[in-house]
Amino acid sequence: MTSPRLHSAILLILVGTGVWAQEKPARYADRWVYVSRNLSKPEHVEEVRAIVATAGKHGLNGMLWSGGLEGIGRWDAKRLARLEAVKDACRQNQIEIIPILWSVGYGSGLGHDRNLAAGLPCTDVPFLVEGKEARIVADPELELKNGGFEEYKGHAMAGYRFHDGPGEVSFVDTDIFHGGKSSLRFENFAGTPHGHGRVMQEIAVKPQRQYRFSCWAKTEDLGPASAFRIQVYGPKAAIAPITVRMPATSDWQQISLTFSSSEFAKVKIYAGLWGGKTGKLWFDDFKVEEMALVNVLRRPGTPLTVTSDDGQTVYEEGKDYQPIADEHFNFRKPRLDCPAIKVTADSRIQDGQRLRVSYYYAMAINHGQVSVCMSEPELYEYWRKSAAGVKKHLNPEKWFLSMDEIRAGGSCAACKARNLTMGEILGDCITKQTEIIREARPGAKVYIWSDMLDPNHNAHGDYYLVDGDFAGSWEHIPKDLVIACWYFKKREESMRFFSGLGFETLAGAYYDADDLENVKGWIKTVDQTPKCRGIMYTSWQRKYKLLPAFGDLIR
């Protein structure tokens, strides 16, 4: 019979050697890392291997993988072999793969059919037939005054609502110009409260029309170059929120952007610097033109009509005029001219006749972002095929819907015919996505980004090019979704909101900082939120230096 002291010693030895030791229960069920690699290159495999090895070593158990996985069913043999290597690495490190896919906001399905893009309306655009072609009739009332910067008094330009600091920040330059004899130069940005160096003019437009603004710009040691912008505003917000890249030093370059006038009769065009610090910027030869049929969309939900000038006669495509398409369709760089309508030999349309053309077109914003239409049935057929591919090659238990930042929609005929709010359209879309996933993988757990469902974030009206209001979207989605909140500033309100509705949640933390203070703030909120499943290391810039410390912090 052993003594009590010896018995205690044996117990300590057994526990210390792991014979009776039990692992400490995990603090969170979901401990993930976000990874973006599409396996188009062999080196991507080694990069993912390194990340998941680090993740596994430091207690993480999931990889949210952005890698073009919605098209996995079309991958070639080499790419599928790389996929198997990644799957093997994840198994070795006990890392679960969670695919993220089907981004409405960032163009899911456009590679399959670009016509699935959200459509902006153009109504009753005038065309004139000359011979066997009809072309847009330029709006005689469209005018941008003093676009060549030739009319001025001192350093004040005529025709413009304002330009910052005439004689201090903005100057007439008769030595450097692109056309004519003068240009507008900006410098001395650091001497202004906000580093502004802008010029703005308000112009009259026709509602629901397509326009292009162009200008010539030149830079010298501009800093930061990212401060350069061209913006078109309606009464409340930007209607052409497009990011224009301009080198810090550059000779004259032409810059152009396409915009919709939406429902407005007047728009404000801004060009210049916001937050400039150093260098010089020149502008010359501003121009605005009405466009037509550029990036025209052809799908059931974006009908095109050609009528007589009085609207009484509707002409038939394929009979009175040849099928219409933009053969130079390009989201990022729309064509500079306008497609013509080709009149057929036996058409009812006569030479010299005026026509009215109504259609829908696609427009990219920011850095080329294009949203897709949630009301077009073909999109859901595409997702069904996509889900089958994901099931076949990954068969994941968890799926993640990339349904963030949906910045266009609600304006095409397909959306209007439903008589639903944008919140209802979004909720219906998410419900269908979830059903498609569970048809392919019964019992799957589905996660989703929070912002378009969160009144503290993007679930509201007046959102970019969206025609409608996302309010109430959270009332129309499956209650067993896991909501991934990522807005750090509103983390407490957001997590409390979804928890109060009975949803499970996940925290999207980190976001490429130089330390883990963001993560520490999230951990505090996570620990106070009922039904929160865990936290994710979310890097968009592929910064994984702090991943080990992150894993140790959430153990």
Regions found by a protein language model. Name each.
Residues 345-365:
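Small/polar beta-strand repeat architecture
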Residues 1-9:
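Bacterial N-terminal signal peptides that target proteins for export
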